[in-house]
A protein has these predicted regions:
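Intrinsically disordered, flexible peripheral segments
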Residues: 1-338
Length: 339
């Protein structure tokens, strides 16, 4: 089994009038349900509107509809049926980090969550500082630096197959504060273009935080991602049901492509097939009791011959001294500049 390790942050465009409702009323309701924490507001744009702390459903829906959450007034121009309502920047931890959280004791789980949240905040801070908004004058599109973004951060700790998968959805409504106080549309070209940079910032931040907090050491970085050193492949594979589902669907669709066209897909065609396989194999997300999941995951680990305490000692190296490195120092300097 080859686990997907291409990017740790993905940018998805959210379109249509139901884009916001998906997260709070529809299939995505699980973002605010069950044992997951409530969403939280991020960004200077959110602060300017008085949005601090937990995400309120009505405020979120108003913003995704391009309206002021308190007054209902339009922020900029009105949306239409095909208008881009926002963007979902999803920051996902490597599988080994998710497993460490899944089977860890209270202290380890707390440190992993705080490390993840800090890395997400640093990545979002970079997005906000480099964001642009766009406007049209006499048919010509102009861009200007943005003064502040709004983001609703929804953190989750499972995949749709109930594997441990720590990740955060940064849902950014398509309304950006311009330097003159107007609310304009986000220039998505820069957001999409910088996806790999955002990925690298989150991943490097997570590694630095976990090394500092728990003494975690890392394998070599491959495609922008690294697993924790000493994490057995058999353990990571056992907690990767979603990856297996996608791999089976990808094989089926690739075989059908070859049968129909008599050739292998080009890189661009394969990228499209991979996206289709991910969507086709995606089960509905349901809530599960956190304690029940934790017990299930520790039972899985035990069946593989590993005890949680021994596994944590093996992966975190908490009995070994932490050795600061240049990457860790550079991350903390960058994070400090964002606060």
């Amino acid at each position: 089994l080859v686990r997907e390790a291409v990017v740790t942050a993905r940018v998805t465009t959210l379109k249509g009038p139901d884009a916001g409702a998906y997260y709070v009323d529809g299939p995505g309701r699980y973002y605010l349900d069950g044992d997951e924490p409530p969403g939280r507001w991020l960004g200077r744009g959110a602060t300017s509107l008085g949005l601090v702390g937990e995400v309120d459903d009505d405020d979120f829906l108003s913003l995704m509809d391009g309206r002021h959450p308190a007054t209902g007034e339009l922020l900029g121009t009105s949306h239409h049926e095909r208008t881009v309502r926002g963007f979902d920047v999803t920051c996902s931890a490597p599988k080994s980090v998710s497993v460490l959280f899944a089977i860890g004791d209270d202290r380890v789980r707390k440190e992993v969550l705080e490390a993840h949240d800090a890395a997400v905040a640093a990545a979002f801070g970079w997005i906000e500082d480099h964001a642009h908004c766009r406007y049209r004058v006499d048919g010509e599109v102009w861009t200007v630096d943005a003064r502040g973004l709004i983001a609703a951060a929804f953190r989750q700790h499972t995949s749709r197959a109930h594997d441990p998968q720590l990740h955060t959805h940064l849902v950014i409504p398509n309304r950006v504060m311009a330097p003159d106080g107007r609310w304009l549309a986000l220039d998505a070209r820069t957001l999409k273009h910088d996806q790999r940079t955002i990925s690298a910032l989150y991943a490097a931040g997570l590694r630095a935080e976990l090394t500092s907090r728990l003494g975690v050491r890392w394998n070599d970085v491959v495609n922008g991602q690294a697993e924790t050193a000493d994490a057995p492949d058999e353990v990571l594979d056992a907690f990767s049901q979603r990856t297996r589902q996608m791999a089976r669907r990808l094989d089926e669709k690739t075989e059908r492509f070859v049968d129909n066209l008599g050739r292998r897909p080009t890189p661009r065609e394969r990228w499209r097939i991979e996206r289709e396989a991910a969507i086709d194999s995606r089960p509905s997300k349901t809530s599960e009791d956190a304690q029940a999941l934790h017990e299930h995951w520790t039972d899985q680990l035990d069946a593989l011959g590993y005890r949680p305490d021994g596994y944590i000692d093996r992966v975190t190296g908490r009995a070994r001294p932490i050795e600061p490195d240049a990457a860790t120092a550079a991350y903390f300097l960058a994070a400090a500049a964002l606060t």
